[in-house]
Amino acid sequence: MRLLKMIGVLTLSALFAVSCSKEAGTTNGPQEGDCPEEMILDIKFLGQSKPSHMEIDNQRKKITLDFAEGVVPSNVELKLILEDGVTMKDPSENPFVLDLTKTCPIVLAYAGKDYRYLVIANLSGNDDENVMRDGPVSDMALMYYGGSHRIGMSDWTSEQLRSNVVYQDRNGKEHWLFDSFLFLETSDGGGHYFESGFDDPNNPRPNEKGANKSDWTKILDKYFAADGPIARLDKEVGNAIQRVSVPVYKRRVVIFLPVPFYRQTNWGTLSGKAMDFSVKADRVEASKWYVDEVIRRFNKLNANYLALDGIYYVAEQLTNNRDYIPTVADYIKSKNLKFYWIPYWGADGMGEWKNMKFDTAFLQPNYAFPQTKPDYDSHFKSIMNFASSKGMDLEMEFDEYALYNNKLGDYRADRVRDYLRAFKAYGVTTKNKIAYYQSNCMVHSLKTSEYKQDNDLYHEICTMIVERQRRRGED
């Protein structure tokens, strides 16, 4: 988890910018001429709890207050200085007191219309249990994106993203769905790979097939473009806040880390030096450069509703990679980021995640993929026993084979339901973090399918996730 550094302040709560709500008779964002451009002119703080920094965003209807380390703003008395004609509605008094250990809405009135603002406190690293915190990852959606082979299948349009941000139940009500989003890719689609040993852990791809510095840069260009998938995700979360509620926890973003292919010499240069990946120090240096780029670009994006949570190591096994990973892990943690890994069942080193200094490892059961369906009892017993013995979390897996009218010749929705059954039987749904492999936008495909069989599966998967989210305070 990264704590966004501000001047003398470590921010912990979300910057949930919200424009005017349609709920309770409010308007959805002032139209031109509806209200003054600046409804709130200033804020006076009357008690002892005073912020070190304040920002009033009248356009987004958001007030952001930064409090220095050690301050618990549970009893903040403030007075709003309002434009002529603007009055208080909720609360009706001015001055008034807010408990800013949680996000607080206030409602102003002007010319017969109501306008909702959110007051958000950015809190320091504080052990008080009442202080709103960055929530840990609970349900992480895998978002494959960036390679040319994904075009037309995994574009992560606004509509596709919306299906992953919120779940629409059978009555049409929306609920918060995934709390975390992992953006990753295996290759550029043109023969350059970000992931080594994908096809055979004992015979990794030739080093000349490794993606180079230009490929690493281009994938980040795509992810962090002003109109790219992360910016679109940020917008969809903001839109959902208007329709659903203010989430208790931030939505988390995790970005994959490519593998510097062992012995690769054509990657490129750093500080004028050609990288030679037979040298551990060069593999570490390239990885550090990439992590720094992720942080820089995420900060530059200036997302309103997302927090950068961590880095995901994209290789699913440790072959030829053990020597440098712990050093990279230390660097990632020095940046207040988490380090994630998702090895497949039977992968080289799948139980060594703690030695590699990963913060969390999700084990892939790989029950969905074999041509012949594995035996349910023995397969999941082996998976769950191993994961439990190693302290690992689990991945749920479903792909296009789960679609009723797929063209692949085999309908495997029953296997997805077996995951749901096993995860419940072994307590995964109540005790573990879960990552969700969904191939190319499968949640959206199931939701929007014309076939009832697919819609039913969508509801079954999402109902499980929503129940997990409710246990952590979301709805």
Residue map of PLM features:
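N-terminal catalytic cores of secreted or lumenal carbohydrate-active enzymes
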Residues: 128-285
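C-terminal motif of bacterial Sec signal peptides marking the signal peptidase cleavage site
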Residues: 16-19
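Bacterial N-terminal signal peptides that target proteins for export
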Residues: 1-8
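Aromatic-lined carbohydrate-recognition surfaces of secreted/lumenal glycan-active proteins
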Residues: 250-260, 274-290, 307-317, 329-350, ...
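Beta-rich interaction/scaffold domains
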Residues: 21-127
